Amino acid sequence: MKTQKRETNPIVTAIESIAEPLCIAEGFELVHVECVSDQGGMIVRIYLDKPGGITLDDCVHMTRHLGDIIDVELEEISAYRLEISSPGAKRPLKKLADFERFLGSRVKVEAVEPIGGRLKFTGILSKVQDGCVEVVVNNEPVVFHFEQISKSRLA
């Protein structure tokens, strides 16, 4: 499955490698992980999804499980706060499967290099085929090779 360039933050990469197998085993999709500096420590945000969406009980359950694993596996993270939530209405699109799932939706796409003099595009996700994503912007189709996309999300 093709995914966009992964996070280069080694802590995020480590958390992703720990969280992904547990999420799959528990029936969740790991959508995104981010770490943000905070007074006296760090906030670790993990965004999860599943068919039908996640509930507050799901968030509590995964916070307990992931928190325990992170505490044991990543001792270098001493002071952190773990937040588990849904990706929400502006969900990031990171895999080709995400684009396929949200065909017909309004999206924002940022290209690695300018296309027609632009980097940022907002339009309707109209096609995913042969490793390419098509977005209709102002009634004009714009085709991105998946590797050309630096960021994308639902709009």
Swiss-Prot record:
It is found in: Cytoplasm. Pfam families: DUF150_C (PF17384), RimP_N (PF02576). Keywords: Cytoplasm, Ribosome biogenesis. One of its GO terms (biological process) is ribosomal small subunit assembly. InterPro entries: Ribosome_maturation_RimP (IPR003728), RimP_C (IPR028998), RimP_C_sf (IPR036847), RimP_N (IPR028989), RimP_N_sf (IPR035956). Transmembrane segments: none annotated. GO terms for cellular component: cytosol. It comes from the Bacteria. Required for maturation of 30S ribosomal subunits. PANTHER family: RIBOSOME MATURATION FACTOR RIMP (PTHR33867:SF1). Belongs to the RimP family. This is Ribosome maturation factor RimP.
